[in-house]
Amino acid sequence: MGKGDPKKPRGKMSSYAFFVQTCREEHKKKHSDASVNFSEFSNKCSERWKTMSAKEKGKFEDMAKADKTHYERQMKTYIPPKGETKKKFKDPNAPKRPPSAFFLFCSEYHPKIKGEHPGLSIGDVAKKLGEMWNNTAADDKQPGEKKAAKLKEKYEKDIAAYQAKGKPEAAKKGVVKAEKSKKKKEEEEDEEDEEDEEEEDEEDEEDDDDE
């Protein structure tokens, strides 16, 4: 896969991302020679962020707002290279894809695992949920699978109705276009008939002159 456009503006950063960046810079100043354990460092940042007051977080939120404004300004003048495919527009009103049985299972047990093991990373929580799902008996999975099947059925009906919304207009335009075409054809035929009648009249006049 080819790399993205190097001239494209860098994506905007969140307030938490600015906070982590500051933490990393502080850590480098204090322990310039020490190697960083990413998982441990990430957990420490997360815990510190949770204990911070709204006033303390405000500084980073202001930085994020300024970065967002800067990013949006740059994106207005950014011209993507030729051949780059644009992202497909997502309609916010379009029906959302239904969750799978496994996703419903994760939604139910995720808070429980986080409560029992608050220090676990996102990756470890996902791994644990996967193991739990694999060890769950088929009978115990059935309620979730039935619920997922119902949601899928509803989604298919909703998406069909959503996609059909634009069709009546298109069909209407098609009818109007056909009617215009028919009318034009009739007008052309009428003009041809008039021309034929004129030619016949001229011929009759010529015959009268000959007599």
Curated annotation (Swiss-Prot):
GO terms for cellular component: chromosome; nucleus. The keyword Cell membrane does not apply. It is found in: Nucleus; Chromosome. Residues 71-96, 161-211 are annotated as: Disordered. The modification N6-acetyllysine is found at residues 3, 7-8, 12, 28-30, 127-128, 172-173, 177, 180, 182-185. It holds the Pfam family HMG_box. GO terms for biological process: regulation of transcription by RNA polymerase II. The keyword Acetylation applies. One of its GO terms (molecular function) is DNA binding, bending. Residues 187-211 have a biased composition (Acidic residues). Residues 83-94, 166-179 have a biased composition (Basic and acidic residues). Residues 9-79, 95-163 bind DNA. CDD domains: HMG-box_HMGB_rpt1 (cd21978), HMG-box_HMGB_rpt2 (cd21979). Keywords: Acetylation, Chromosome, DNA-binding, Nucleus, Repeat. Binds preferentially single-stranded DNA and unwinds double-stranded DNA. Belongs to the HMGB family. This is High mobility group protein B1-like 1. It comes from Homo sapiens (Human). The gene is HMGB1P1.
